Amino acid sequence: MGLSDGEWQLVLNIWGKVEADIPSHGQEVLISLFKGHPETLEKFDKFKHLKSEDEMKASEELKKHGTTVLTALGGILKKKGQHEAELKPLAQSHATKHKIPVKYLELISDAIVHVLQKKHPGDFGADAQGAMKKALELFRNDMAAKYKELGFQG
């Protein structure tokens, strides 16, 4: 299920575009997630009160959290699958403290792909999309395995 060197290169090329403006990408990913799947908002105490897209766009806390999410994901993607050290604390907090089900990781993965398609249509063609989906699936599968080790049935 690993990615080829060429696939990792496609992932990292598009991720370079994300890193050029992580706050706006992170904000858009979370807004896309919350709009498409309002139930996910319930896992975020500090965002539960945000009901409209305008409120979400105006929230500095949401932008800050989006930055945190994509910065962590970028660190994992750059490891090209060798992300055990980065994944362990993330899985620990998401399983035991935040109780984020694997399904929600799938939903945010879809939101990431959606935002990249929207913001970078010329740089995120079918090959890059396929590679990114594969990289995000690898991340989710490894998170799920860690969840299992921790006894979390998310």
From Swiss-Prot:
Molecular-function GO term, any one: oxygen binding
Alphabetic keyword roster: Cytoplasm, Heme, Iron, Metal-binding, Muscle protein, Oxidoreductase, Oxygen transport, Phosphoprotein, Transport
Residue ranges that the Swiss-Prot or TrEMBL entry lists as coiled coil: none
General function of this protein: Monomeric heme protein which primary function is to store oxygen and facilitate its diffusion within muscle tissues. Reversibly binds oxygen through a pentacoordinated heme iron and enables its timely and efficient release as needed during periods of heightened demand. Depending on the oxidative conditions of tissues and cells, and in addition to its ability to bind oxygen, it also has a nitrite reductase activity whereby it regulates the production of bioactive nitric oxide.
Subunit structure of this chain's protein: Monomeric.
Other remarks on this protein: Marmoset, woolly monkey, and squirrel monkey have a minor myoglobin component that appears to differ from each major component in having Phe-Lys preceding position 1.
Organism of provenance: Saimiri sciureus
EC assignment: 1.7.-.-, 1.11.1.-
Annotated residues for binding of O2: H65
Name the UniProt record assigns to this protein: Myoglobin
Residues annotated for heme b binding in this entry: H94
